[in-house]
Amino acid sequence: MKPMKNLLLMGLLSALGAGGALAAERSHFTHFITRDGATLKDGDKVFRFAGIHAPELHRIEDDARGPCRADPRGWGQYFKWPTAQEQQNWIQAMVQTGAKAQRVYVLSVQQEFDKACGRETHILAPETADGMPRLNEKAMRVYDNMIAEADKQGLRLILPFIDHWWWWGGREQLAAFYHEKAEDFYRTDSKTFKAYLDVIRQVITRTNTVTGRAYYDEKAIMAWETGNELEDTNADFLHQTAAWIKKWAPHQLVVDGTYKKINPFALTDPNVDIVSNHYYTNADNNHPGQVTQDLRAVGGQKVYLVGEFGLLPADQLNAIMQSIVHSEVNGAQAAGGLIWGFRGHRHDGGFYWHKESTGHYSYHLPGFAKEGEANQEQAVVDLVRTAAAQMAGQQTMAPLPKPEAPLLRETTSPFAINWMGAAVGRSYDVERAASPTGPWTVVGRDISDGVNEWNPETMVLFRDDYRQLQLGHTYYYRVTAKNESGRSAPSNVISVQHSEENQPPVVTLEPALTTTQDQGVELTASWQDDGLPSREVKVGWQHAGDGQVHFCHADRAQTRAWFTAPGTYALTFTADDGLLKSSKTVTVTVGEAAGKAPADFCRYHGEVYGVAEGRLTVM
């Protein structure tokens, strides 16, 4: 497009865009990020960054719920939209640990199993057979807030459009709207490619409902990426896509979102600013030397970025990150690198998490040495913070700021107290009072919310001590966050009336059993408890007789017993919650041996008996 026509077009878009541009709030950034040869610039300053890749700033894969069984692919997950407070917290955690830029995951595409799994997506099927895809307004408002929050807190964003893969719905699902194949996405004469371009147009020209600005005027958006790991990108596809993005967003950069290689045609495309690669072991490029290899291939013609790498031990990740920081070819260096991958605080306590097929978990900020030990979490977070500091010309990472106050959530039980953790909080103290103004008593110290595989259905951050509370009384709680730099101000105060009276465990047991001496008997009891005064319930079997009964494991609900003589025996199972207990008795009638007794009754037929069985019902 000729320059004059382009200027007229952008002027028209600005006039139509946020119905006012006069109503748009002022950006917290002074400059768009620009490209100067092989270097990114913020104004006249070189812009480089390191971080932990945050794929889910705009859509959450809620692993705690497990896979959706209605999705026959087997791994199909449940998804939900993050709350505004979650987005604010996550971005704050990144910025306060040194991040200057972040790449998110793609826009999700509707597919056939979404309805059965209750999933919502960013891109919806067209309303007519050959119509264009539609943007889901609910989803895009979450996207709006992500961009607004990034602007407010000083984080630049790299935003890819469509996925090569089908995890969130990608090119295959887009093609399905038009009864085409996944590979048609890369054909510039296909209906799928036409739809892809229209999605790009709709997104870039969208008016942000939070800031009032058109997306193409958002300085927080550093770059648009053609997609995620588009490994079949060809010259015509990239040429048309990059030109289309620049047509609508002339002030923002364009990333060739390819994978496993540097496309020579990207280096000569005038509309491509950044070339990217992802390093993974299955791509045979997950090593420090790949940085120099790619920089040589780029030859200083474009900015080079390592958009993702990871799923390695911390020492190997550090070697790659240090190569990203220091490698140089004819004066050109990588602009940045992002380790896969981050998950943030949950709105109502704990962290989201994800476990890769390699066994690696997502990383939590600011890093948790004990809870993340198996994942080397603290070492990984620290190596990233160090790299970010080095890129900024510093020798060591800056200390964390003191945490801000956590957000204590309302509850109906003093035994289910949760809070949204501070962005860089490492541990928490819980205080209780009899009035909303104190005096306050610390009732919980050094509580961590960094547990991996957090399940909000079964876990809570803090349970008060039942023995210290009086039934019917109202208590007040507040929480403070701590890290190595200090302590936060107290959280908001909540009030809770203690109305839960401890009930004894409920035991279920068969009343009578019959066996012979050579068989012994399998004993199976079950119990339910209200979780008070704690979640610990001691169980046990006993016989008040003359020692002729032997238990494999008397302290387990399921076990075996054997008898030294025929007779009738009363075996009692007891469940004790520490304050109250319940018992039931089974009468076992034992006849004379009908065969040879086993050498070991506790390994009867090769099975080991004694598995504990019980259930807590938390009220």
Predicted regions and their residues:
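Pro/Thr/Ser/Gly-rich low-complexity, intrinsically disordered linker/stalk tracts
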Residues: 390-424, 471, 489-501
